[in-house]
Amino acid sequence: MSEYLLLLIGTVLVNNFVLVKFLGLCPFMGVSSKLESAIGMSMATTFVLTLASILSYLVNQYLLLPFDLGYLRTMSFILVIAVVVQFTEMLVQKTSASLHRALGIYLPLITTNCAVLGVALLNINEKHGFIESAIFGFGAAVGFSLVLILFSAMRERLAAADVPTPFKGGAIAMVTAGLMSLAFMGFTGLVK
């Protein structure tokens, strides 16, 4: 039980996919200008990452490995992710049309979010079992969500602040992301 908790904490804080592995930077920078959009994207990405991680494990274990189709791993994982994203988009559109409009193009772009594919591939490379795959996917999603929401809140405050002209927009966002990354480095010794 404790190894599962350590895996979760390690994935969320120590080995954060955005700040340490630099995966998922497109939605991190693109959706983080408004807190409402960031929260919606976080919920959608959490659902997609967790479900895609579990389904990718099942596809690998019960389809690719028994038939010696390891060379189709990346293609099959992309297909699994695309199906999960389409399901999520239909779910969001039916439950919250305003959130669907707010997320706009970023919801279908979860398919191309390298963090989602990265989690699926890292699960296989690190030889995680079913439970570890689910925890790893959920932890990566929670870490992504945590960073996205914190970054979004900071960007909203920076939009109202008196930022020097050369630093407005993307420049101050990159400086802020760098400072967040430094703050998360403080968790480095937490989990081995």
From Swiss-Prot:
GO annotations of cellular component type? plasma membrane
Would the keyword Transmembrane helix be found if you checked this record's keyword annotation?
yes
Q: Which GO terms describe its biological process?
A: electron transport chain
- Which InterPro entries does the protein's record reference? Ion_transpt_RnfA/RsxA, NqrDE/RnfAE, NqrDE/RnfAE_oxidrdctase
Q: Which domain of life is it from?
A: Bacteria
Q: What is its EC number?
A: 7.-.-.-
Give the enzyme class: translocase
**Subcellular localization, per the record?**
Cell inner membrane
| Pfam families (alphabetical) | Rnf-Nqr (PF02508)
For membrane topology, the record states: Multi-pass membrane protein
Q: Which UniProt keywords apply?
A: Cell inner membrane, Cell membrane, Electron transport, Membrane, Translocase, Transmembrane, Transmembrane helix, Transport
Primary place of residence? membrane
Spans through the membrane: 5-25, 39-59, 65-85, 102-122, 134-154, 171-191
Q: Which NCBIfam families match?
A: PRK05151.1 (NF003481), rnfA (TIGR01943)
Function of this protein?
Answer: Part of a membrane-bound complex that couples electron transfer with translocation of ions across the membrane.
Q: Which family does it belong to?
A: Belongs to the NqrDE/RnfAE family.
Q: Which PANTHER family match?
A: INTEGRAL MEMBRANE PROTEIN OF SOXR-REDUCING COMPLEX (PTHR30335), ION-TRANSLOCATING OXIDOREDUCTASE COMPLEX SUBUNIT A (PTHR30335:SF0)
Q: Could you describe the subunit structure of this protein? A: The complex is composed of six subunits: RnfA, RnfB, RnfC, RnfD, RnfE and RnfG.
According to UniProt, the name of this protein is Ion-translocating oxidoreductase complex subunit A
Q: Which organism is it from?
A: Shewanella pealeana (strain ATCC 700345 / ANG-SQ1)
Q: Gene encoding it?
A: rnfA
